[in-house]
Amino acid sequence: MTGVAAPERIARAVRADIRALTAYPVADAAGCIKLDAMECPYELPAEVRDDIARAARETPLNRYPAAANPALQAQVRQAFEVPAQAGLLFGNGSDELIHLIIQACCEPGDTVLSPWPSFVYFDMAARLSHARFVGVPLTAGLELDLPATLAAIEAHQPKVVFLALPNNPTGGLWPDAAVRAILDAAPGLVVLDEAYQPFAGHTWMPRIMDEPNAVVMRTVSKIGLAGLRFGYLAGHPAWIAEFDKVRPPYNMDVLSQAVLAAVLRHKPVLDAQADRLRADRQPLADGLAALPGVTVFPSAGNFVLARFCGKLDGNAVHLALKTRKILVRNFSNAHPLLADCLRISVGTPTENAAVLSALQDILSA
């Protein structure tokens, strides 16, 4: 029996816009200094890992996870200072939460808006849901263009506005007054993405119950738990109840919940790691700025964005680092405003010294 060739069958079954995409690339990091994904470079201490192992042993795997986990919710509220009156929703990282928000709010053709460039998944999740994504360009200095953003909100009437605070990949933290103006202008929901909040020393979380059209979204990925895939959304219970309706059943597996509960009993360890990375950010930025032909942008995250405009452009520098087994994220071709830009995660002092030494050799050759 002969059938239709697989490519033809795929063309009939899979959406054209999906076939035009490429899968999210993840570089092979074996044997490399990994400074490309804003991960915490420090492994958890032995006593924390022991508690994780104990929690995993005691977790029944033959049952589905409970629809709600009041004990874990209480831990998250205490650990991350979520207001007692706020609704709380868990997701598999912030990626799933972005999907849930757009699915709940947007019909095909509705607008999702964000300053741009920013977190790429705002755009992707909107398009996957047949929403229209509007990215409002940042200034040439990669700052928020507030007049343009307010004009775009007025023109496009977005159902959802995403604000990354601080912004990824630029590192900028938009002023409170600008965020306030966007909150006042937005006709729908404003999502305050605080993925990098532990490194910024600034949050909207204590004020979230005063904002009728906003929610705060966070992840634990940047503070040492990237492998766990856990994010949470906080805001008025009425918003959270709507997003909960589109949450997949049993979306948070029992092991992730058990591991998070074990780790949160050691929250000071996570805080200390974040504080260390925050302290090491400026020396890394200063070292980059001292290199010939390098411009460094201010960052409130656990990374630094640098533009290479000397003898070698961003693509060439990225390749040269890769040959030296040092991975950083190349944004040179991602957006015109990011031409020749590389994003470098803050690593351990040894890793930071290694990338600076390698760049010194590369740029002086």
Swiss-Prot record:
The keyword Cell membrane is annotated on this UniProt entry: no
Gene3D superfamilies the UniProt entry points to: Aspartate Aminotransferase, domain 1, Type I PLP-dependent aspartate aminotransferase-like (Major domain)
Enzyme Commission number(s) of this protein: 2.6.1.9
Keywords in alphabetical order: Amino-acid biosynthesis, Aminotransferase, Histidine biosynthesis, Pyridoxal phosphate, Transferase
Superkingdom: Bacteria
Swiss-Prot/TrEMBL cofactor(s): pyridoxal 5'-phosphate
Pfam families, alphabetized: Aminotran_1_2
Pathway given in the UniProt record: Amino-acid biosynthesis; L-histidine biosynthesis; L-histidine from 5-phospho-alpha-D-ribose 1-diphosphate: step 7/9
Residue positions where N6-(pyridoxal phosphate)lysine is found in the record: 222
One Gene Ontology biological process: L-histidine biosynthetic process
GO molecular function: histidinol-phosphate transaminase activity; pyridoxal phosphate binding
Catalysed reactions, as listed in the record: L-histidinol phosphate + 2-oxoglutarate = 3-(imidazol-4-yl)-2-oxopropyl phosphate + L-glutamate
Top-level class of the enzyme under EC nomenclature: transferase
Record-linked HAMAP family: HisC_aminotrans_2 (MF_01023)
Family: Belongs to the class-II pyridoxal-phosphate-dependent aminotransferase family. Histidinol-phosphate aminotransferase subfamily.
NCBIfam families documented for this protein: hisC
Quaternary context: Homodimer.
Record's protein name: Histidinol-phosphate aminotransferase 2
Organism: Bordetella bronchiseptica (strain ATCC BAA-588 / NCTC 13252 / RB50) (Alcaligenes bronchisepticus)
Organismal lineage: Bacteria, Pseudomonadati, Pseudomonadota, Betaproteobacteria, Burkholderiales
